[in-house]
UniProtKB/Swiss-Prot annotation:
The chain crosses the membrane at residues 1-21, 29-49, 79-99, 101-121, 128-148, 156-176, 200-220, 225-245, 254-274. GO terms for biological process: heme O biosynthetic process. This is Protoheme IX farnesyltransferase. InterPro entries: Protohaem_IX_farnesylTrfase (IPR006369), UbiA_prenyltransferase (IPR000537), UbiA_sf (IPR044878). One of its GO terms (cellular component) is plasma membrane. The gene is cyoE. The lineage of its organism: Bacteria, Pseudomonadati, Pseudomonadota, Gammaproteobacteria, Enterobacterales. It catalyses: heme b + (2E,6E)-farnesyl diphosphate + H2O = Fe(II)-heme o + diphosphate. It is a multi-pass membrane protein. The keyword Transmembrane helix applies. The keyword Secreted does not apply.
Amino acid sequence: MIKPGIILGNIICLSGGFFLALNEKLSKIFFLKTVFGLILIISSSCILNNIIDRDIDKKMNRTKNRFLCINTNVFLLKILFFFSIILLILGLLVFYIYINFLCTIISFFGFFFYVYLYSYLFKRKTYFSTFVGSVSGSLPPIIGYVAVNNCLNRCCTILFFMFSFWQIAHSYSIIIYRYSDYKLLNLPVFPILYGKLKTIIFISICILNLFFFNFLLYFFGYVKFFYFLYTSFFIFLWFIFSFLSNSRYFTIKIWSRIMFFFSIFIIFMISFLMSLNNF
């Protein structure tokens, strides 16, 4: 229901932004409160996403055994809905009371984009849903950064574009790997509407943009050279591999699965090296 993998990934991204901004000592409790607030809001988002997507999930091999696909009791849905609202309110209160008002606004903004705009409004209607979803996916490192600095600046803008482009490339890799499921549901996603080849080209463009905005972090002095060197190397490898979908060594299904895991590795390394930047 609460998708532990998504929560863990977002905690890692938040940590990257948090420690990137950290120039002086803050208590460990402050960091844990920031993480706790994020966990509450993402848990709420995941529950509501499962409620909204339960009819789609029933038809997909990857998701057909999820809790709400098996248990369709209306009373249960109401309980889960109210529980998710409680989690949202608690998360916002944690940010408002213990962190700052700006984090509260940004986290609610992410919730709104993911639950209402992406899951409810756009996912079944337009391929732009992926871009809308990437907005919410880009916010955890910004929340971490703002928790420390209590301001939005140029670094936040760079982080926004970095993580948005990563999110799109990551999502399209999943869709290509699960292509038959999305084709069966006839969801209006880019790979179904425009084909795998154009999607692969678009993935490469997104990775190139990630490389560019990652460079801007170094260019404007937000990160040290060691961060730029190592992250550039890993992003470059990901970029090169994005051109190997039609090679004799991989089927496109195997390629897309490797791209998916590669993307997870990339975002982990970016966030991890950000966390080390000021140490």
